[in-house]
C-alpha cells in the first residue's frame, strides 16, 4: 500500500521501516522479525490471527492510529509457516540483518531474506519427502500460436527444470501429470487459464506482463546458465517454452533472494517419449490418488513403493505417471529389476545401504543455496560414506544395466574427509548454538576455546575459594546475559561480605556482587566466546561453500541412487507378490496369461483369493473384446487390471501375471463408471460423452482403450445406440483401430461378434444353484444373456418383500411383453434359463463382417416393456428420427444434438 509523506511522518521509525518493506511485498504476508518474535500488522495481522488462532492485539504507531498486530516466537516458525502456506498464501520472511548492539540507537536494519510460496519452499515441514514440489509457469501463444502453450516446471529443492510446448487442449493433461503446487501466469491471462481447466488444484500467482516477454525470458535464461545460446539444451526452437521457462526462473530468483546454482540445466520434456495419460485415466486407474478420498491408500503407488529413500520415492511416482514408449529404455529398466530379482542377497544388501542414506537430491539443493545446516552436511557425509559399499555390490553384480550405474557413480572420498575433519559427529541444529567445529580443525579456534575454558575453570574455582575466604557456605557464582558473572550472597550472611565486593543487583533474599578480578575474567571469557562464535560461523560457511562447488556431482549421484532405489524396490515388490517379467516389443499384440489386479489382490480379505484372467488383444483378430456379465461380477476389475499391467510393463516393472507379452501403447484411455461434474454444469451423460469424444478423436491404432458401461447415463435406446456405434467406429476406422476392452450391460452388443470379424464376446462366469448365484470372477468366451439384477439387489440387502415383488414383476413382463420371434439372437432377452454355454449367434441375419447391418430397432422397440399402458405417441416420432440416422455417418456432435432434439420431443 502506498503511504503518503504525512502518514510516514506520523508513524514511529519502526513502523515506517515496516511499511517501506511491506510496499515491496504487497501480496505476501510479511513476518517482521522483532527480537525473538515474528510480528505481523494491519490486514496481515488479522489473517495471521484467524489462521493460526493467535491473539490479535494493537501496537502504538506514534501520532498515527494504533495498528492491529499478531505475532509468535521465532522458534515457532516451523509449526506456523505450513498453516499459512497450505492456505494458499505467500509469506515474506523479514529478518534483522544487523546486530542490535551495532545499530547505534537507530532502528535495526531489516530485509526480506526469503519469500515462501506453495511452489517455492526449502522448509522440510512444507515438503512431502516422496513428492516433488513443482512451480510451473504457463504462457499462452498468440497469433498463429493462439491454440498453443509454453509450459515449464521447476522443483526449487532439487533443481529439476523442464519445458515443453503443447496444444492448448493438452493443458489439463500437463497439469495432471506434473501436479504443480503453484502456477504463475500473465495477470491478463488468469481467466483464460481457469476457462481451460475443470478444476484448479493449485495456487495461481499472477505476474506482470513484461515477465512473459520473449527477450526478457531469453536473457534471464542466458544469464543464469552463463551461455550465449540455448542450443546446448535443445530448447532454443521453443519460443513459447522459453518464455514460460524464463518467467519461472525469474520468479524463483525473486522469491529466494539469491543465486540458484543447483539449477544447472533445463530439459526438453517430450510427450512422445511417454504414454499419454489423460486426467480421467490417471484417476480411474488410481495411480497416485484414490478415487474415494484422493488419498494414498488403495493406489498403485501404495503397492509399488518399496523404495528406501525419499528421492527414490519421488522418482517412482514420476515413472508411474510418465511410462515409457521406447522399447530399448523399457528393457534396460527391466534388465536392472531382473538382476535384483535374481540375486536376493544383492537386493537386500543394496536396500540396506540405501536405507542408511539421506535425501541427497534435496540436500544438494540446500547446500547450493546456502541453506544447509550442520546436520545436513553430516547427512551428506553419511550418504557418501555408503557409496564404496554400493559400488562394490554393483561390481559383483552380473548385470550391464546395474553396471551402467556403477560406471557413473562417484564416491567422493575427499568430500567425506573434509566434512569429517571439520564437523563434530553430532552438531547442534543451529550454527549459533556453537560447538559444531571439531577440535584440531582450526588452530585459532582451538586457542580461543582454551582461553574460554581456562577462564571458566577459574570462575568455577572462584566459588570454592571465595566461600572459604569469606566463611559463607551458601556463596554461589553464577551468570546471566544481562549482568554477566556475579557472586550471590544470601541476606543471612550479608554481614560477612568483604569490602572488595561491589554490589550489582538486589534480590528479595540475596544480593549479587562483582569483583574487579571477576569482571576482568568475564571480559576475557566473553570476548573469546564471541570470537569463537564468529569464527565457527566463518569456518562452517567456508566448508559449505566448498561442498557447494561439488553440487553437480551430488545431483548426479542422487539421480543414479534414485534409479537404483527404484530398481531394487520394484524387485522387492516382484518377489513379494509373485510378479513376472513381461516381454515388451514394438508389436501390437497384448497377451496376458493369468493376469491379476495389483491393488485388488492385496486388499482382499484373508482366504478370498484373487481369480486371475487371461486377456489377448491384437489388431488382426481380437481387436475389440465385448465383456458382459452382472454388476459386481468383476468386469471393471478385469478392465483396469489390463490397463495397469500394460502401464507397469512400460514403466519397466515386473507385472502380476504368469506371463505377459506387451506391444507398447502410445496412450491408455479409460471411460469407467458414471460420475457428475456438477460444478461445471455437466451431467453424468455429458461427462460420458465428453470422455468418449476425447477417446475417439485422439486414439490411434497403437492405443489401448478401456470402455466400461458406456451409455449408462441416458435411456436404454440412446445408450445402446451409442455403444453400438462406438464399437463399429473403432472396428471400421483403421486410423483409430485401437485395442479395446468394452464392458457393458447391453447384451444386445453380443450380436456384434457375428457381424464384425475382429469383435469377440467374453463374459464373467456365474454359477447358479437353487436360486443362489456365485460370481466366479472368471473371464470366459461368449456373451452373457442375463443380468442377475434382482440377485445382486438381494445380495445388497434389499427387503425380502421388495425382492419377491421384483421377481413377480419380472416374470409378468417376460411372459406378457417380451414376444421374442425368430430374430431373438438380435439381442432380445431369451426366456430360456441362463446357460454357461456361449450363444451361438446362428439366428443373426447379417453375416460376419457386414458392418452396415445394424439391429432392427423397430422390432426391438416393439419387444420392450410397457409398464403403464400403450407407448407414448412421442415414442413413435422418436422411432422415425432414429430410422433416419446413419450411424456410419453421424458425428459425435450431431449425435448429441439429435439426442437433445429427442429429449425435447419427449418433454413436449
From Swiss-Prot:
Q: Does the keyword Transmembrane apply?
A: no
Briefly, what is this protein's role? This protein is involved in the repair of mismatches in DNA. It is possible that it carries out the mismatch recognition step. This protein has a weak ATPase activity.
Family as reported in the entry's similarity comment? Belongs to the DNA mismatch repair MutS family.
Name the UniProt key words of this record, in alphabetical order.
ATP-binding, DNA damage, DNA repair, DNA-binding, Nucleotide-binding
Q: Name the source's superkingdom.
A: Bacteria
Q: Which InterPro entries match?
A: DNA_mismatch_repair_MutS (IPR005748), DNA_mismatch_repair_MutS-lik_N (IPR007695), DNA_mismatch_repair_MutS/MSH (IPR017261), DNA_mismatch_repair_MutS_C (IPR000432), DNA_mismatch_repair_MutS_clamp (IPR007861), DNA_mismatch_repair_MutS_core (IPR007696), DNA_mismatch_repair_MutS_N (IPR016151), DNA_mismatch_repair_MutS_sf (IPR036187)
User: What is the protein's species of origin?
Assistant: Salinibacter ruber (strain DSM 13855 / M31)
- Gene Ontology molecular function, alphabetical: ATP binding; ATP-dependent DNA damage sensor activity; damaged DNA binding; mismatched DNA binding
Start and end residues of each stretch annotated as Disordered: 822-863
Residues annotated as binding ATP? 629-636
Query: Which Gene3D superfamilies does the entry mention?
Result: 1.10.1420.10, DNA repair protein MutS, domain I, MutS, connector domain, P-loop containing nucleotide triphosphate hydrolases
This protein is called DNA mismatch repair protein MutS
The GO biological-process annotations, alphabetized, read as: mismatch repair
Task: Give TM regions.
Answer: none
> Its GO CC terms?
cytosol
Q: Which gene encodes it?
A: mutS
Amino acid at each position: 500500500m502506498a503511504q503518503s509523506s504525512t502518514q510516514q511522518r506520523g508513524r514511529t521509525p519502526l513502523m515506517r521501516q515496516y511499511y517501506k518493506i511491506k510496499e515491496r511485498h504487497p501480496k505476501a504476508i510479511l513476518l517482521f522479525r522483532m527480537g525473538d518474535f515474528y510480528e505481523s500488522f494491519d490486514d496481515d495481522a488479522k489473517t495471521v490471527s484467524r489462521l493460526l488462532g493467535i491473539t490479535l492485539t494493537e501496537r502504538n504507531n506514534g501520532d498515527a492510529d494504533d495498528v492491529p498486530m499478531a505475532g509468535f516466537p521465532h522458534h515457532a516458525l516451523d509449526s506456523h509457516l505450513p498453516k499459512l502456506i497450505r492456505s494458499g498464501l505467500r509469506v515474506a520472511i523479514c529478518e534483522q540483518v544487523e546486530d542490535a548492539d551495532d545499530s547505534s540507537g537507530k532502528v535495526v536494519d531489516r530485509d526480506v531474506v526469503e519469500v515462501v510460496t506453495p511452489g517455492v519452499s526449502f522448509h522440510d515441514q512444507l515438503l512431502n519427502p516422496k513428492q516433488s514440489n513443482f512451480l510451473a509457469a504457463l504462457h499462452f501463444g498468440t497469433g498463429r500460436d493462439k491454440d498453443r502453450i509454453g509450459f515449464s516446471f521447476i522443483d526449487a529443492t532439487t533443481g529439476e527444470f523442464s519445458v515443453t510446448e503443447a496444444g492448448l487442449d493438452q493443458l489439463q493433461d500437463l497439469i495432471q501429470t506434473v501436479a504443480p503446487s503453484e502456477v504463475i501466469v500473465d495477470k491478463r491471462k488468469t481467466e483464460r487459464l481457469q476457462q481451460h481447466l475443470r478444476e484448479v488444484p493449485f495456487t495461481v500467482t499472477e505476474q506482470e506482463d513484461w515477465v512473459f516477454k520473449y527477450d526478457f525470458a531469453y536473457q534471464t535464461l542466458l544469464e543464469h546458465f552463463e551461455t550465449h545460446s540455448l542450443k546446448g539444451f535443445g530448447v532454443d526452437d521453443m519460443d513459447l517454452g522459453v518464455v514460460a521457462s524464463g518467467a519461472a526462473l525469474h520468479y524463483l530468483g525473486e522469491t529466494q533472494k539469491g543465486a540458484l546454482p543447483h539449477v544447472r540445466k533445463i530439459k526438453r520434456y517430450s510427450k512422445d517419449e511417454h504414454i499419454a495419460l489423460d486426467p480421467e485415466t490417471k484417476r480411474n486407474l488410481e495411480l497416485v490418488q484414490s478415487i474415494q478420498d484422493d488419498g494414498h491408500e488403495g493406489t498403485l503407488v501404495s503397492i509399488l513403493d518399496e523404495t528406501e529413500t525419499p528421492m527414490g520415492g519421488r522418482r517412482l511416482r514420476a515413472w508411474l505417471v510418465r511410462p515409457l514408449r521406447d522399447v530399448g529404455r523399457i528393457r534396460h529398466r527391466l534388465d536392472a529389476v531382473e538382476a535384483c530379482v535374481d540375486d536376493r542377497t544383492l537386493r537386500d544388501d543394496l536396500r540396506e545401504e540405501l536405507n542408511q542414506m539421506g535425501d541427497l537430491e534435496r540436500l544438494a539443493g540446500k547446500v547450493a543455496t546456502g541453506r544447509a545446516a550442520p546436520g545436513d552436511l553430516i547427512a551428506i557425509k553419511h550418504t557418501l560414506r555408503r557409496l564404496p559399499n554400493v559400488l562394490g555390490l554393483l561390481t559383483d553384480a552380473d548385470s550391464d544395466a546395474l553396471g551402467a550405474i556403477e560406471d557413473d557413480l562417484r564416491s567422493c572420498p575427499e568430500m567425506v574427509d573434509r566434512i569429517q575433519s571439520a564437523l563434530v559427529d553430532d552438531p547442534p541444529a543451529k550454527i549459533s548454538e556453537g560447538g559444531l567445529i571439531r577440535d584440531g580443525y582450526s588452530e585459532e579456534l582451538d586457542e580461543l576455546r582454551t582461553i574460554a575454558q581456562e577462564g571458566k575453570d577459574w570462575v568455577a574455582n572462584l566459588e570454592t575459594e571465595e566461600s572459604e575466604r569469606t566463611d559463607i557456605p551458601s556463596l554461589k557464582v553464577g551468570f546471566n546475559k544481562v549482568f554477566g558473572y556475579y557472586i550471590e550472597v544470601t541476606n543471612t550472611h550479608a554481614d560477612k561480605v568483604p569490602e572488595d565486593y561491589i554490589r550489582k543487583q538486589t534480590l528479595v533474599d540475596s544480593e549479587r556482587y562483582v569483583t574487579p578480578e571477576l569482571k576482568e575474567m568475564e571480559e576475557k571469557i566473553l570476548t573469546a566466546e564471541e570470537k569463537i562464535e564468529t569464527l565457527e560461523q566463518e569456518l562452517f560457511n567456508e566448508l559449505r561453500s566448498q561442498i557447494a562447488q561439488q553440487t553437480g556431482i551430488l545431483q548426479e549421484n542422487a539421480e543414479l541412487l534414485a534409479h537404483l532405489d527404484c530398481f531394487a524396490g520394484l524387485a522387492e515388490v516382484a518377489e513379494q507378490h509373485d510378479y513376472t517379467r513381461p516381454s515388451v516389443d514394438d508389436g501390437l499384440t497384448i497377451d496376458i496369461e493369468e493376469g491379476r489386479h495389483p491393488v485388488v489382490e492385496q486388499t482382499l480379505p484373508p482366504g478370498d483369493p484373487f481369480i486371475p484372467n487371461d486377456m489377448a488383444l491384437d489388431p488382426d483378430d481380437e481387436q475389440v473384446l465385448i465383456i458382459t456379465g452382472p454388476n459386481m461380477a468383476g468386469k471393471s476389475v478385469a478392465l483396469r487390471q489390463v490397463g495397469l499391467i500394460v502401464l507397469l510393463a512400460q514403466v519397466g516393472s515386473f507385472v502380476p501375471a504368469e506371463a505377459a507379452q506387451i506391444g507398447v501403447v502410445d496412450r491408455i484411455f479409460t471411460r469407467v463408471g458414471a460420475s457428475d461434474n456438477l460444478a461445471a454444469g455437466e451431467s453424468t451423460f455429458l461427462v460420458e460423452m465428453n470422455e468418449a469424444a476425447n477417446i475417439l478423436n485422439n486414439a490411434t491404432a497403437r492405443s489401448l482403450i478401456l470402455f466400461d458401461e458406456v451409455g449408462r447415463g441416458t435411456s436404454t435406446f440412446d445408450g445402446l445406440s451409442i455403444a453400438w456405434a462406438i464399437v463399429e467406429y473403432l472396428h471400421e476406422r483403421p486410423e483409430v483401430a485401437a485395442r479395446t476392452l468394452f464392458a457393458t450391460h447391453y447384451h444386445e452388443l453380443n450380436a456384434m461378434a457375428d457381424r464384425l470379424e475382429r469383435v469377440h464376446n467374453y463374459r464373467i462366469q456365474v454359477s447358479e444353484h437353487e436360486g443362489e448365484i456365485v460370481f466366479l470372477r472368471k473371464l470366459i468366451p461368449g456373451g452373457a444373456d442375463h443380468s442377475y439384477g434382482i440377485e445382486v439387489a438381494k445380495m445388497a440387502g434389499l427387503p425380502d418383500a421388495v425382492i419377491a415383488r421384483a421377481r413377480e414383476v419380472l416374470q409378468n413382463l417376460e411372459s406378457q411383453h417380451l414376444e421374442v420371434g425368430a430374430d431373438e439372437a438380435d439381442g432380445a432377452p431369451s426366456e430360456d434359463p441362463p446357460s454357461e454355454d456361449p450363444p451361438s449367434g446362428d439366428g443373426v441375419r447379417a453375416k460376419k463382417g457386414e458392418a452396415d447391418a445394424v439391429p432392427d430397432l423397430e422390432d426391438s422397440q416393439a419387444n420392450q416393456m410397457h409398464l403403464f399402458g400403450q407407448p407414448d405417441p412421442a415414442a413413435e416420432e422418436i422411432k422415425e428420427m432414429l430410422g433416419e440416422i446413419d450411424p456410419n455417418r453421424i458425428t459425435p456432435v450431431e449425435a448429441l444434438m439429435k439426442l437433445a432434439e429427442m429429449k425435447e420431443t419427449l418433454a413436449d
